[in-house]
Amino acid sequence: MKRLPILLLLVLAATSAFALDTVTRGKRIGVLVSRERYEGAESAMSASIAKYLREELVKAGFDAFDTKVTYDDLSRNATTAADYYVEIAASDATGGVPGGIGIGNSSVGVDISVVIAHVAAEVRLYDGRSLELVHRFELDKSRKGIAPTSISIGGSNLFAWIAIPITEVVQFRRAAHAVAKEAAIQVAEYRQAD
């Protein structure tokens, strides 16, 4: 009877020991803030891609979080809280309106145009333990759509015209989201191969 509790304790300890998996990597991914060398539109595009990337990683089943630090800050700080870190190392966005048509009468008019947005990004994946670069990939996506781009009001003596920039912003957001979705797929494929 005295041996039964000891035997039970040994069985429970052995079961707990086998439950520890030191080989499989976790699903915790930190999304790093872009380096400070980016300004203006590049910084905004990089931040937008990072936001969408975190959302796409969460949809894919990862425990993704915003680190609120750059890679340089993380490398100086010895503590790491993720299995992998993702950084949007570079981003670029171009776009424009290659053509359109004006519709209206003598008082009111609307320009309807083709709006094109192209977004490219370099995404880097770092090991969470050593902070070494383990994978780098370049992505680019384009989105286009037809939308009203300006409104005009006029008469016989005066004519006023105002642009509607939101249509271009929407296309850039769609392209940034497409880049982030592709980046999440690439990260998931790399993790499965690891």
Task: Give residue spans per PLM region.
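A structural "domain/chain start" motif
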Residues: 18-71, 76-77, 161-194
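Short, charged/polar low-complexity linear motifs in solvent-exposed/disordered segments
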Residues: 104, 150-154, 191-192
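Surface-exposed short loop/turn segments
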Residues: 78-136, 140, 144-147
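Sec-dependent N-terminal signal peptides
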Residues: 4-13
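N-terminal compositionally biased, intrinsically disordered segments and leader/signal-like regions
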Residues: 16-17, 81
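Short acidic, glycine/tyrosine-flanked loop/strand segments centered on an H-E-D-like triad
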Residues: 139-161
